[in-house]
From Swiss-Prot:
SMART domains: Adenylsucc_synt (SM00788). Residues 1-25 are annotated as: Disordered. InterPro entries: Adenylosuccin_syn_GTP-bd, Adenylosuccin_syn_Lys_AS, Adenylosuccinate_synth_dom1, Adenylosuccinate_synth_dom2, Adenylosuccinate_synth_dom3, Adenylosuccinate_synthetase, AdSS_1_vert, P-loop_NTPase. This is Adenylosuccinate synthetase isozyme 1. It comes from Sus scrofa (Pig). Its main location: cytoplasm. Homodimer. Keywords: Cytoplasm, GTP-binding, Ligase, Magnesium, Metal-binding, Nucleotide-binding, Purine biosynthesis. Substrate binds at residues 43, 331-337. Mg(2+) binds at residues 43, 70. NCBIfam families: PRK01117.1, purA.
Amino acid sequence: MSGTRASNDRPPSAGGVKRGRLQHEAATTGSRVTVVLGAQWGDEGKGKVVDLLATDADIISRCQGGNNAGHTVVVDGKEYDFHLLPSGIINTKAVSFIGNGVVVHLPGLFEEAEKNEKKGLKDWEKRLIISDRAHLVFDFHQAVDGLQEVQRQAQEGKNIGTTRKGIGPAYSSKAARAGLRVCDLLSDFDEFSARFRNLARQHQSMFPTLETDVEGQLKKLKGFAERIRPMVRDGVYFMYEALHGPPKKILVEGANAALLDIGFGTCPFVTSSNCTVGGVCTGLGIPPQNIGEVYGVVKAYTTRVGVGAFPTEQINETGDLLQSRGHEWGVTTGRKRRCGWLDLMILRYAHMINGFTALALTKLDILDTLDEVKVGVSYKLSGKRIPYFPANQEILQKVEVEYETLPGWKTDTTGARKWEDLPPQAQSYIRFVENHVGVAVKWVGVGKSRDSMIQLF
């Protein structure tokens, strides 16, 4: 082999691409996406913020999770519940995109769409694009999810409290490189069927009591394949075109929340995907320089579904009042949510990871009847204040919360539509949160409807 490099083998720096062009391309990163993320344990009201921003968006995307998420949106007095579909699907002028980081249960997708069609959702299938690289959730994944919870309860006396939607088992299949994707379903169905049978057998060998109708599921999946075929695109190319074509407003709807993140959440009581800002890049196939605004959504108090440490939880009349006034029941599971005071250690931790550019503070009106409002501002461990959020559950359960007590406003805020309409004590509460976290509050929620979000700047 000759030691002389052929002219077409030389690297770009040797003259294949002009340096000025490289510099220009580096400067032109394309459009930037706006990201909406949960800053607590979920159920913060992300769907409402997304719905607000989606009114003038061109593309609304989901980047992770599956139909374990639960977003409620109220439009014209109608309440829509979304689990897998981006809640921006209501916007008839926008495209909704399910990215490669999402795990898709096809029966659940169509069931959800049909339920919302009865409430007024129209022509959703014409506005939905699904990444060909998204992994699939199968019925046996959901069955295994339930079996694993039963095993945990029997062996450890407690379970994780999953939604039993098959999300964890589906992501496990993905991580084990055994999962099946949308592109597999739409290619050679015989090959897909063979891999599906093998995957089902693997799960049956691990869970001998697992009962699954393999051939029945394959028959249904073949039907679903034809229904979704018109919606499926190469997701990476779709996003690249969207970012580098004519300027577009692109919105990313995060599911779950920071403390449910598989890497940064309160393990093991977490979900199985990255629901922090890094999941946007890996779940859509976009580079970090295309991340623009990152909005953190935080409830004016704290809630959690299922088990796990909860430092500011109020197992008393205050907790009951928050649960009752806030109608704190899980959208996906119907389970009662645990309630407590706002925890700023959690919020600061979520900000460290996500770099929020602004916050949306929701459900302020739920605090309207309280004489005083407490806010958790720091943790102590063995009598010493700690500056970090503990990774270990046992340690988190032992922390002592230091509270600041603020005066309540004892005024109905549900009619407020601008900053000046809020009582001075409510304004002070909002400023207190801003000052302690170091991030400005852009929206304040005082009710269910779209117009009950007060925009501050």
